[in-house]
UniProtKB/Swiss-Prot annotation:
Keyword Transcription regulation found: no
A cellular component annotation (GO) from this entry: extracellular region
Native organism taxonomy: Eukaryota, Metazoa, Ecdysozoa, Arthropoda, Myriapoda
Name by which UniProt lists this protein: Antimicrobial peptide scolopin-2
Tissue-by-tissue expression: Expressed by the venom gland.
Protein localization: Secreted
Further details from the record: Minimum inhibitory concentrations (MIC) are the following: E.coli standard and drug-resistant strains (MIC=5.0 ug/ml), S.aureus standard strain (MIC=0.5 ug/ml), S.aureus drug-resistant strain (MIC=1.0 ug/ml), B.dysenteriae standard strain (MIC=2.5 ug/ml), B.dysenteriae drug-resistant strain (MIC=5.0 ug/ml) and C.albicans (MIC=7.5 ug/ml).
One example of a Gene Ontology biological process annotation: defense response to bacterium
Regions crossing the membrane: none
Cell cycle keyword on record: no
Main function: Antimicrobial peptide against both Gram-positive, -negative and yeast. Also induces histamine release by mast cells and shows moderate hemolytic activities against both human and rabbit red cells.
């Protein structure tokens, strides 16, 4: 449903942020 899509989108966003953070450090 729409909630699943939203959660998946949020998860991807967090994952990208974490990856950038790791690359930064």
């Amino acid at each position: 449903g729409i909630l699943k899509k939203f959660m998946l989108h949020r998860g991807t966003k967090v994952y990208k942020m974490r990856t950038l953070s790791k690359r930064s450090h």
